[in-house]
Each structure stands twice: as C-alpha cells, then as structure tokens.
Amino acid sequence: IAGPIFLPATTMALTFAEFDHTLRDGRVVHVREMRPEDEGEFVQTFDRLSPDARYMRFMRFVKAPDMKRLREVLGSLHEHGFGLVATVPAADGYDIVGSAIYFLGKDPSVCEFATTVDGDFAGAGLGRLVMTTLIAEAKKRGVAVMEGFVLSENKPMLRLAARLGFAIASDPDDRSVSYCT
C-alpha cells in the first residue's frame, strides 16, 4: 500500500482468517480480528506498556487509557476500518501482545494506521507481522493508500515502515513527527 497504489474499492463483506504464527524467538502468537469484547485486554495491554512506549504510541504522555475512545474504536471498526490483535495464552484467557489498526478517512480508499507491540515482544518480528497482515487486509478491502504519523524519535517504527516500503518525510508543520505513506 506504500505510495499511490490505486485498487478498486470492494463492497463485498470480507472475513479475516485467523492464524497462528511462530515468531523469530520461537514464541507462537494467534492473530485475529479485534473484537469489542477485547476492551479489558486492551486495558491490561496498556498497563503493561512502559511510559516511553505509551509516549511513542500515543505521541504524548498518557497515564490511563481513554475508555470512551477505546469503546468508540472497538465499536466502529466494522464501519470505519479494520483492526487485528496478536494474542498469547494467559491465566485469564489471553493477553494482547500486539495490535494494528487502520481507520478510513473521508476518502474510503485512504486510511491511517497505528500499531502497538508489547515491549516483551520487541525484536521478535511481531511488529512486522501485524503490519504486513494489516497491509494485506487493507489491500483486500480496497484501500489504495495507507498513511501514518510516527514520532521522529521512534526509530524502530520508522525503520519498519521503511522496510515495508513506506516513504517517510518530516511533517512540515511539526518536525517531531514523521509522515509515512
């Protein structure tokens, strides 16, 4: 999706095929579509993120999850975008250790992405997995252009975006932010 790739929009209902994937370090994650009932697990995921990881993800310091916004996002994905999670088994059922999401803009052929990876899974290939899966799903659903805003100091995400084919430029209005498209 990097760059201006124009695909025909699709109007057919699409389903996401869940799958298991073995990461570079041997751990196995289960990848599936986000669901509204993931709310509690997203709160736990947020709580496990370091303050620096939260800053890199939300582009500002955030002490607690915005529950209203979380419910809005989880409740509107089928109409306005798509999200996926990577999970591992946990004592309470499962933990979300990675996620990627896109939301469509006014032009339904353009979307904005965001991704999060649990710090314990950094460097294992999980970020690449959730992003490549998100990109493939966006293409399948007729998205032509994917874009994202990343803090310029978030070098791991910028390296990943570059390896995935995104063009990266500084935001002319805010040099602390890089624009990936």
Show the residue positions of the predicted features:
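Long, contiguous binding/interaction regions
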Residues: 6-181
